[in-house]
């Protein structure tokens, strides 16, 4: 017995599966889903039950479709109808319209009669219900068509108000107008010939702009859909007074036309926006060209990109200009000075090379600041700096004591000034800064420094003693510094004083008194009693007014160290004379080779001050080391810069000091012994084993030449390291190595400090060289030069060849003719020659730093990974 499934029954009755399943379950059938099967009796009973219900599936489904159509506001797309029915309009114009319509009606009537025959088999209740539904749908369709036509006409009139008035069209009108009117005629014909159609209409596939025949699904008991008229390939022709008839457009055509019309409008809007944006993009934004600078300030080594930024031009333009000038370059290639100047001439501007200032050269910076201060417009009057100079015990400190109203000379050792003292004296609301210099012959450098930083020199000469050697020296210092001299003839109150004799003596040195027709001021004073001291001060102020001494207090402070010392409680202390600008507490400073920040600042009376103006002597603390007298003081913007400059200057000074120190070597041993009257020759001895070290030490200590013997200050086993070099440098000794090598760090340190390292592998050769050097008969003919160092990274053992070492050149180079040493843990394992040198599979003459190579050593195969290979050459040197 054949069985049917639930979904087959639902398909025949055009009812949803869930309704059939529900009904079958109500009838008591064992049904779980639409895939459950029923026999013929169950099917017959189920069908009768479904047909007897008041609700018909097709009616229910059609009501959904009609309600969906009621909600949609359809606008007929004139363009879609025009394209689809263009050929039908052509037939109408040629008289074939009637014949085609008659055939179409006959086909439609035949289909309808066939459908009626099929539906007669249904029961009367279903037929009546279906007829009611058809009538209702036809009425709804007619009403919807009328609304659509009215809205279409209204829209057409709004868009083309003039075209809607035209009824007769000539053959010369445009195809677009023909298609618009043809659409209206097609719609009228469809409305006239259309019969009621069934509710079940399957929409065609949403292919745009394609006039395909709509697909119709035949569903019982629904009437077939009216097919679209066939199109012909003949070219349409039109009569002059021909007016098309309107036809009604089917629902499916309206829906499809509406969709295509909406899509076209969306595309048009989108394309319009895209075109507008493209038009905006097509308009190139013109870059405002910046003018060329008047002067090109360049640095040698700049490339096209750097020059483009300075010239306000693109790098490509710079490269093009250089190409036209015959210079092939790219944007990143460095250019030399001549090329940059040539480019500047091409642009018609001047070129000026930027000079880099070495900020560690504070002497140059000091001079520059002094020149800028003199050219400044914000200059103010400053106190004169006066240096008191003269022979020892002529009364310089006594005069200063009188000026300061203190007893200074009693505190000096032996009555002689031991250091420069700086003091300020107030006279008639004006300040004068005095510097007291030593008068002893041993302090000539201090007198010279005092003359360099002063404005006026007061030369003190004792009336009872006359001109002395230090007096003449003071005159020379003052003249070399270009400083005016005021002569103070002191001790006129003493018996035997003869001021005129002093004036006569000074005339020999170019100091002619004003009273005798010269230009040198002479004042006869007594520092002890204070006679004419006031007149001396007035002369100082008068000379200062003539000189117009000025300074800029707003710029960075610069000064000079008068004296410096190390204080137990305060650290480094420096006496500073501020020459330009204002020095403040907290300023980062560099003084000579030292640096720091001003922590405490005190004046000449011992009081703390926060700032020091020009021509003010102060005492400062906060330096990392003690500077030297006459060192320059410069203030920097920040402490970081001051620290870097100070450290760099200290490093440069140390290197310079090492260059000047001459260490003892075997080459200069004999000369050093004679020059310094040496009694011992200090040697640092290093050997590979303790036995060799002891034997060498005993042999060397037996050597004695002309009362000079060898002193082994240190003996050890192993490679020569940094501590050995440091010890030899501090002891003015040289290093002897027996079968050992120095480390790379120790070798670099020895080269920088000038420590001599001699390496041997024969014990009697050590004895001969040291003894010959002490006798002055050392004649070296060859000198070993290390050319490179290698590290063994891998080894391979090959029969008939031996061990091949894969090595990396750490520094220098190795050649095929080089001597080679195998060093393991600082001990020389073998000293021989290179047997072969290869790079990959090719024999090479040389391998430089940073490359790998394969190397074999003559008569030696005990090479291990991490062994150090030292390549060297023997060079002949002249006898020293």
Swiss-Prot record:
Alphabetized UniProt keyword annotations: Cytoplasm, GTP-binding, Initiation factor, Nucleotide-binding, Protein biosynthesis
Biased composition (Basic and acidic residues): 34-43, 59-69, 82-94, 110-131, 167-181, 230-240, 248-261, 276-292
Residues in coiled coil: none
Domain tr-type G: 381-550
Species lineage: Bacteria, Bacillati, Bacillota, Bacilli, Lactobacillales
Annotated region described as G1, given as residue ranges: 390-397
Stretch list, region G4: 490-493
Any matching Pfam family: EF-G_D2
GO molecular function, one term: translation initiation factor activity
Organism: Lactobacillus johnsonii (strain CNCM I-12250 / La1 / NCC 533)
HAMAP family named in the record: IF_2_B
InterPro entries: EF-G-like_DII, IF2_II, IF2_N, P-loop_NTPase, Small_GTP-bd, T_Tr_GTP-bd_dom, TF_IF2_bacterial-like, TIF_IF2
Region ranges (G5): 526-528
Region (G3) residue spans: 436-439
Binding residues annotated for GTP, in chain numbering: 390-397, 436-440, 490-493
Subcellular location: Cytoplasm
Record region (G2): 415-419
Start and end residues of each stretch annotated as Disordered: 34-297
Stated role: One of the essential components for the initiation of protein synthesis. Protects formylmethionyl-tRNA from spontaneous hydrolysis and promotes its binding to the 30S ribosomal subunits. Also involved in the hydrolysis of GTP during the formation of the 70S ribosomal complex.
Similarity comment text for this entry: Belongs to the TRAFAC class translation factor GTPase superfamily. Classic translation factor GTPase family. IF-2 subfamily.
Name this protein carries in UniProt: Translation initiation factor IF-2
Encoding gene, per UniProt annotation: infB
């Amino acid at each position: 017995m054949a069985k049917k499934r639930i979904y087959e029954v639902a398909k025949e009755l055009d009812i949803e599966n869930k309704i059939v399943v529900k009904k079958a379950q109500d009838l008591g059938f064992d049904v779980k889903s639409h895939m459950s099967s029923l026999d013929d009796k169950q099917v017959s009973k189920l069908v009768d039950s479904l047909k007897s219900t008041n609700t018909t599936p097709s009616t229910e489904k059609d009501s959904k479709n009609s309600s969906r159509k009621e909600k949609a506001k359809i606008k007929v797309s004139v363009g879609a109808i025009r394209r689809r029915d263009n050929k039908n309009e052509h037939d109408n114009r040629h008289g074939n319209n009637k014949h085609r319509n008659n055939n179409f009606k006959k086909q439609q009537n035949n289909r309808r009669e066939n459908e009626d025959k099929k539906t007669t088999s249904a029961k009367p209740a279903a037929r009546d219900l279906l007829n009611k539904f058809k009538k209702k749908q036809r009425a709804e369709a007619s009403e919807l068509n009328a609304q659509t036509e009215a809205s279409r006409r209204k829209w057409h009139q709004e868009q083309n108000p003039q075209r809607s008035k035209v009824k007769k069209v000539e053959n010369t009108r445009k195809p677009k107008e023909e298609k618009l009117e043809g659409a209206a005629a097609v719609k009228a014909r469809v409305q006239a010939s259309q019969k009621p159609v069934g509710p079940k209409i399957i929409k065609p596939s949403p292919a745009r702009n394609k006039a395909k025949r709509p697909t119709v699904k035949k569903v019982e008991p629904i009437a077939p859909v009216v097919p679209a008229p066939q199109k012909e390939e003949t070219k349409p022709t039109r009569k002059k007074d021909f007016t098309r008839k309107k036809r009604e457009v089917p629902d499916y055509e309206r829906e499809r036309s509406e969709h295509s019309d909406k899509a076209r409008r969306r595309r048009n809007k989108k394309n319009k926006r895209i075109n507008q944006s493209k038009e905006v993009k097509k308009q190139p934004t013109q870059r405002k060209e910046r003018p060329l600078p008047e002067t090109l300030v360049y640095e040698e080594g700049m490339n096209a990109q750097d020059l483009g930024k300075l010239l306000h031009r693109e790098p490509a333009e710079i490269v093009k200009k250089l190409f036209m000038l015959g210079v092939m370059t790219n944007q990143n290639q460095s250019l030399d000075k001549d090329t940059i100047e040539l480019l500047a001439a091409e642009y018609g501007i001047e070129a000026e090379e930027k000079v880099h200032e070495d900020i560690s050269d504070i002497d140059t910076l000091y001079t520059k600041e002094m020149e800028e201060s003199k050219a400044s417009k914000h200059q103010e009057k400053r106190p004169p700096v006066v240096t008191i100079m003269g022979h020892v015990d002529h009364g310089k400190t006594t005069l200063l004591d009188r000026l300061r109203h203190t007893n200074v000379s009693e505190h000096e050792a032996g009555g002689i000034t031991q250091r420069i003292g700086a003091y300020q004296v107030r006279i008639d609301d004006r300040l004068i800064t005095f510097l007291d210099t030593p008068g002893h012959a041993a302090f000539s450098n201090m007198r010279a420094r005092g003359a360099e930083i002063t404005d006026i020199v007061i030369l003190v000469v004792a009336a009872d003693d006359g001109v002395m050697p230090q007096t003449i020296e003071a005159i020379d210092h003052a003249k070399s510094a270009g400083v005016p001299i005021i002569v103070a003839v002191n001790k006129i109150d003493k018996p035997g004083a003869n001021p005129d004799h002093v004036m006569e003596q000074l005339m020999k040195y170019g100091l002619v008194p004003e009273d005798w027709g010269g230009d040198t001021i002479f004042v006869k004073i007594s520092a002890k009693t204070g006679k004419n001291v006031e007149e001396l001060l007035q002369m100082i102020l008068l000379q200062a007014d003539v000189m117009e001494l000025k300074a800029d207090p707003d710029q960075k402070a610069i000064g000079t160290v008068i004296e410096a010392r190390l204080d137990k409680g305060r650290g480094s202390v420096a006496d500073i004379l501020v020459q330009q600008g204002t020095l403040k507490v907290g300023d980062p400073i560099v003084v000579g080779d030292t640096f720091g920040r001003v922590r405490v600042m005190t004046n000449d009376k011992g009081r703390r001050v926060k700032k020091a103006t020009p021509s003010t002597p102060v005492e400062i603390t906060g330096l990392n080391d003690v500077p030297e007298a006459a060192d320059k003081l410069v203030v920097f913007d920040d402490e970081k810069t001051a620290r870097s400059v100070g450290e760099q200057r200290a490093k440069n000074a140390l290197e310079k000091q090492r260059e000047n120190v001459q260490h003892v070597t075997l080459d200069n041993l004999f000369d050093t012994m004679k020059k310094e009257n040496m009694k011992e020759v200090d040697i640092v001895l290093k050997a590979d084993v303790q036995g060799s070290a002891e034997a060498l030490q005993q042999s060397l200590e037996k050597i004695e030449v002309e009362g000079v013997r060898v002193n082994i200050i240190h003996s050890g086993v192993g490679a020569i390291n940094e501590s050995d070099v440091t010890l030899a440098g501090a002891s003015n000794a040289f290093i002897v190595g027996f079968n050992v090598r120095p480390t790379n760090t120790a070798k670099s340190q020895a080269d920088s400090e000038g420590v001599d390292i001699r390496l041997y592998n024969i014990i009697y050769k050590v004895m001969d060289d040291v003894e010959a050097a002490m006798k002055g008969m050392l004649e070296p003919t060859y000198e070993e030069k290390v050319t490179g160092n290698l590290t063994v990274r891998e080894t391979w053992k090959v029969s008939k060849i031996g061990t091949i070492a894969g090595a990396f050149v750490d520094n220098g180079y190795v050649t095929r003719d080089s001597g080679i040493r195998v060093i393991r843990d600082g001990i020389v394992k073998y000293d021989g020659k290179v047997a072969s040198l290869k790079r990959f599979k090719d024999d090479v003459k040389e391998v430089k730093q940073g490359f790998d190579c394969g190397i074999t050593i003559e008569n030696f195969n005990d090479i291990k990974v991490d062994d150090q290979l030292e390549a060297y050459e023997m060079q002949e040197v002249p006898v020293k």
